[in-house]
Amino acid sequence: VKIAVIKLGARIHDNEGVGNSTNEVLSTIKMLTKGGVTVDVYTKVLKKDRLSDLFISYNIEDEYGNINSRDYDALMVLNGNVNFFGGAEDKSQILNYTLINSFKGKVVYMLYDPLLLLKQLWPAIHNKEWASNWNEKDIVITRNDIKYITQCKNLDPLYDKGLTGMGIAKYFPLEKFPLLTSEEYVIDFDNVEWDLRYAGTWRGGRRQRSLIEFFFGLPEDISVQLFGNLKIDQFSEKKVSDLRLPEFGSSVTHEEAEARLKKALSTVVIGDEFYIKTNDVAQRSYESIILGNITFMDSRYDYEKRIFSDPELKKFLYVDDRIQLADRIYQLKKDTKFASDLALAQKKDVAIDLDEYCNDFVRCIKEI
């Protein structure tokens, strides 16, 4: 099997210091290659990019016209937002849409984030001063056979929003890919820097309610840090009120985020309202488990309690509010052996056959 891969809103590269978006791309490609697929990527290639042992890179501006002569079984499109920063033309991103339209074969859209549905790009182009460089018919998606593979278990809200070029949508547990791509780690709970840590972005304030519920207002003897692009001035003063504030850390790369989580006792996995509607469990759930964190779940978010199968883990790790969370963190701080045993039990509970997982992913692409 041979698949061409493009990414909306970002380049594809295998350099050091990648962000979450690029990590998602590389993880998907690792799933493909472990499942026996040969992968070529079409992207903007820079001289500084190092050669990857996962894929061959083609500079999209030079090679987009050759894609149909290379006998691909599918074109895979990874979700993202295309932005023209400062109004500048981004040829590589516009050519992604040309490839979607012109590819003579199966087009698969990978929907990790339910808010990153495939959108028409021409409305963002037609008023730009450089719009005359492009033909509308090459960019407006008219095909109706695009296959969506998504980690959203409830597809109805996606259908309600309308899926551009949709032929069919199918659930696959993409949220489990950190079990393949994150390196397992054992935390020394007697020497952690923080009791509770969360890595994330503001996401337009869509997680403000949950962030305040679980990371604000905790007792003074529970140390809390939020890091990423989160800042206190983003939060509503009225909603925060006089609650004790967490510390705010800096923005980091994906590797740096993992390194920080390895120095924390616990985290809480939360989600947007639309994540709840679509029953989309975050990749962070499995990533934090593999990294060794005690991983609490917002019970309102993962309402089916499908992360863990062990009833005792479900009982302890699903929390309704900051009161329950604080009580359980105190139990962990008081008995670090219990914390270590719990961290190991989490890993064992979520363990899967990785070869089978990747083979199932490739089979899903073939069958959809």
Model-found features: residue ranges?
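Short amphipathic alpha-helix with an adjacent loop that forms part of the alpha/beta core around
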Residues: L54, E61-R70, L332
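A charged, aromatic-enriched C-terminal amphipathic alpha-helix characteristic of glycosyltransferases
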Residues: K333-E367
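C-terminal "capping" alpha-helix adjacent to the active site of nucleotide-linked donor transferases
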Residues: L317-F338
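Hydrophobic, well-ordered secondary-structure elements that form the walls
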Residues: S288, L325, Q346
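Nucleotide-sugar donor-binding catalytic core of glycosyltransferases
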Residues: K2-E61, V77-T98, L111-K314, L354-Y357
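Short beta-strand/loop segments at the ligand-binding rim of alpha/beta enzyme cores
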Residues: K104-V107
